[in-house]
């Protein structure tokens, strides 16, 4: 049974975890997978301007009903521009904006040893503890 297309923003570390995002997109395009979504994520934002990036991310987050957070190795690492971002890094910013927008949170922990973004803790997120379709679908249904 196919799930109806959920409007999902995917929060991930572009430098280190984009392959996981691309895998979600591939599942979405493959009828053999139950995982299906209306991708509200941004393409790479072609700007170094913090306020431009914030505005683009916020607009896309506000178009979504769900936010999937891919928790990779660097997910809670302090960004060099954290003071300007207003959060430890971009993923923490995206989680905070998702919570403000009322998005349901789904966290996918790639490795149990990876530190979760601080804004994800005590957020009521639904968790998947492996990057598998079954674990992710269960977390999506429980969100």
Language model features: what each stretch is:
Residues 17-20, 76-79, 113-119:
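Short catalytic/ligand-binding loop motif for oxyanion handling, primarily in non-cytosolic enzymes
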Residues 64-65, 102:
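Short, well-ordered alpha-helix to beta-strand connector turns
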Residues 100-106:
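A short helix->loop->beta-strand "cap" motif at the edges of active sites that frequently abuts
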Residues 1-63:
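Conserved N-terminal substructure of TIR/SEFIR domains
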Residues 12, 71, 109:
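Short beta-strand/turn micro-motifs composed of small residues
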Residues 1-7, 111-143:
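C-terminal interaction surface of TIR/SEFIR-family domains
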Residues 75-100:
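Conserved TIR/SEFIR loop-to-helix hotspot centered on a Trp-containing motif
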């Amino acid at each position: 049974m196919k799930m109806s297309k959920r409007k999902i923003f995917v929060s991930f570390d572009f430098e280190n975890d984009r392959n996981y995002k691309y895998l979600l997109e591939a599942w979405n395009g493959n009828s053999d997978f139950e995982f299906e979504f209306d991708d509200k994520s941004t393409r790479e934002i072609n700007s170094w301007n913090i306020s431009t990036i914030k505005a683009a991310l916020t607009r896309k987050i506000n178009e979504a009903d769900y936010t999937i957070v891919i928790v990779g190795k660097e997910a809670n690492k302090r960004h060099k521009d954290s003071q300007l971002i207003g959060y430890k890094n971009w993923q923490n910013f995206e989680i905070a904006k998702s919570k403000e927008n009322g998005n349901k949170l789904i966290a996918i922990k790639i490795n149990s040893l990876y530190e979760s973004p601080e804004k994800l803790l005590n957020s009521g997120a639904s968790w998947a503890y492996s990057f598998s379709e079954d674990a992710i679908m269960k977390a999506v249904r429980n969100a």
